[in-house]
Amino acid sequence: MYSYIKGKVVNNGQNFVIVDNNNIGYHIIVSNPYFYEINKEYKFFVHFHIKENLQILYGFNDNKNLLFFKKLLDVPTIGPKSALMLSETDNLEQVFQAIENNDNVYLRKFPGIGIKSAQQIILKLKGDLIFSEKIILNPKKTELEKILLNLGFVKKEIKSVLNQIDDKKELELMLKEVLLKLAKNI
């Protein structure tokens, strides 16, 4: 329904800001409302969440955080509050790494995330953070992934093998190592 709302923050509370856009005040739930200065204009990437008889806007500074939030909502044990805390962390890359490395201890540091929820997040999202691959992978690994996809390999297998190799080598040597590892999996 909404992609983003751009406007002036006119008020903030414990977990929300009120954004004035063309004389309409939007109540947007955010992780840290005190980050936003009153009477200053911001752009919020928003998710319109409908629950029973409630309609709620969740706001993010960056579209990447919004996309991750939406993916978290697909995890059965994760609700909007927990998803907001995970997706608005200062170090989103570290959350992605924790998911890719099965690190449920790191994920449990977030409020509302227990062992079951952490395991569900890893199970549901590992290898599926497509929008974040530029953060997780360096340029050589991104190039390797494109080559391997063109050769017909499956994305999940590729990501698994790419996480095992040293990215400080030449691209050709990395490709050879990846192909050998993928051949062992066949």
Swiss-Prot record:
Keywords: Cytoplasm, DNA damage, DNA recombination, DNA repair, DNA-binding. Residues 134-135 are annotated as: Flexible linker. It is found in: Cytoplasm. One of its GO terms (molecular function) is ATP binding. The keyword DNA damage applies. One of its GO terms (biological process) is DNA repair. Has three domains with a flexible linker between the domains II and III and assumes an 'L' shape. Domain III is highly mobile and contacts RuvB. The keyword Lipoprotein does not apply. HAMAP family: DNA_HJ_migration_RuvA (MF_00031). Residues 136-186 are annotated as: Domain III. Belongs to the RuvA family. The RuvA-RuvB-RuvC complex processes Holliday junction (HJ) DNA during genetic recombination and DNA repair, while the RuvA-RuvB complex plays an important role in the rescue of blocked DNA replication forks via replication fork reversal (RFR). RuvA specifically binds to HJ cruciform DNA, conferring on it an open structure. The RuvB hexamer acts as an ATP-dependent pump, pulling dsDNA into and through the RuvAB complex. HJ branch migration allows RuvC to scan DNA until it finds its consensus sequence, where it cleaves and resolves the cruciform DNA. SMART domains: HhH1 (SM00278). It comes from the Bacteria. GO terms for cellular component: cytoplasm; Holliday junction resolvase complex. It holds the Pfam family HHH_5. Residues 1-61 are annotated as: Domain I. Residues 62-134 are annotated as: Domain II. It comes from Phytoplasma mali (strain AT). Homotetramer. Forms an RuvA(8)-RuvB(12)-Holliday junction (HJ) complex. HJ DNA is sandwiched between 2 RuvA tetramers; dsDNA enters through RuvA and exits via RuvB. An RuvB hexamer assembles on each DNA strand where it exits the tetramer. Each RuvB hexamer is contacted by two RuvA subunits (via domain III) on 2 adjacent RuvB subunits; this complex drives branch migration. In the full resolvosome a probable DNA-RuvA(4)-RuvB(12)-RuvC(2) complex forms which resolves the HJ. This is Holliday junction branch migration complex subunit RuvA.
